[in-house]
Amino acid sequence: LYLDATTAAPSDTWEGRGKTMEIMSEITYKLSTDPENEKLLSYLEANRDELDDQTKREVEVLRKDFDQTKKIPAEEYIAYSVLQNDAQAVWEKAKNENDFAAFAPYLEKIVDFNRKFAGYYNADMKPYDALLNEYEEGLNTQTLDAFFAQLRSAIVPLIAKIKEVPQIDDSFLYK
């Protein structure tokens, strides 16, 4: 539906897509959190030695996805999917009209949902760390702070040196 929405579907069909997203998200949630999947994952994990490296990694990813999705209440999972659809439609229009204010409430709701989801994923982590771990496993703000501090210590003096160099006469470019 997303591909259809961003390529070929008429812009005024977003509400219908939202209803479809609601139905599909509910089905996806039920399938994704089905106890039978838990049994299958447990079986594969118990027989890990029989799996090739690719399948082992796929099982790890599936387990993580299963565990994370299961932590989110179904109604919030569904509501978030519908919100994403609605926000996409509003963003497209707001972008074309240079009207961020129209999109701002949707962005705020998306951020609120993600903060809530971060608490479900790991209540003991800072929300940003919990969400960052979703996309960059093992990375956290402490590591990023150290990285950017090191980067800053090299870049700031470099910029200062660049500023000290006399400007090149480029006036011929503008004749």
PLM region spans:
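N-terminal helix-rich structural modules
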Residues: L1-L107
